[in-house]
Structures are given as structure tokens and as C-alpha cells.
Amino acid sequence: TVSKEDKEKTIGCTGIYYANSMIPQGELELEKIVHSFAAKKFLNSYLLKEGVKEEKLNEELLKVVDIRYGKPYEDETTKKCDEFIFKLISGSKDEIKKIAESGIY
């Protein structure tokens, strides 16, 4: 089971990935956009499995997106989320990579 704190941090990171995935392609390398899409998709499923209600999740994600929308990509913030998620959820790095490579977001 994931602690409440880790769950909240995961939701925060999911929101960051979501916001990143909305950055126009000309402003950010496609690879980073695709990684963010894949991470958002993976974490969405993960959080629902962990018992987060879909409505609450969407609400929380939109809060993060509202704050970050239109702001430039933050490498440091995204890297910290990657590290946190890869450590928290075993196999997540490979799963996210698989989603990114499958081209299905």
C-alpha cells in the first residue's frame, strides 16, 4: 500500500507530466512530450488501482495543469518526478518506456 503522502506526490507528478504533454511540439523535444504522455497514462491507471477516485484524480490533475499551463518545461521538476516514480513503483520505468514506444497514448 502506498502512503497518503506518496499518493499525493504521485498525483502531483502526474499533473506535471500531464502539463508537459500539452506543450506544443515546437517548444519541446518530441521525446520528452511522449515520455510525459506515457508517464501520465501509466500513473493514471496506477492511481485508480490504488483506490483514488477518478473524479478526485481528474480534479487534482487539472489543478496542477492550471498552475503550470503555458509555463515552460521544467527539466529539474520532471527529473525529480521520474526519480520518485521509478523508485516508488517497481517496474514503472520499463512500463512507461513500453507505452512511449507503443505509440498508444
Task: Give residue ranges: language-model regions.
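A broad "ordered helical/assembly scaffold" signature
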Residues: 1-2, 96
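Compact alpha-helical subdomains of small soluble proteins
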Residues: 30-105
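Short N-proximal segments of mature Sec-exported proteins
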Residues: 2-51
